[in-house]
């Protein structure tokens, strides 16, 4: 069994991900099991800049940003599981498969991000992600990412 790694507040998330406003889409980690899974959350507010144009009068979080939130949660899981915190390594998308959007995500929602590692080989991980709203599936996908040095290193 994997080692329980516990919760992480926004300060820890900021130390693990290079993303900053407006692209940081993980607010905190509820729980994490090394080499296995993470449960993180994103509080979706009307202050998100994308709601200005998506859509006026009917704000809905863009699906690609829900997938990005899942990928960021997966990045936290990968960096922590591999003991790479503080290394400067980045997690890059390589592919996304089987994305399904089932419920719209709106201002005021708390988006629960559940990501599981399906496979890890060297510096490449395959994940399964589920974004939930109040226990109901909003978005699901599988994605592959590579852990590597930043460009220019």
From Swiss-Prot:
Name the record gives this protein: 3-hydroxyacyl-[acyl-carrier-protein] dehydratase FabZ
The entry's keywords: Cytoplasm, Lipid A biosynthesis, Lipid biosynthesis, Lipid metabolism, Lyase
Free-text function comment from the UniProt entry: Involved in unsaturated fatty acids biosynthesis. Catalyzes the dehydration of short chain beta-hydroxyacyl-ACPs and long chain saturated and unsaturated beta-hydroxyacyl-ACPs.
Assigned EC number: 4.2.1.59
Record-stated family: Belongs to the thioester dehydratase family. FabZ subfamily.
Primary location group: cytoplasm
Gene name, Swiss-Prot/TrEMBL: fabZ
One cellular component term from this protein's GO annotations in UniProt: cytoplasm
Catalytic site positions: 54
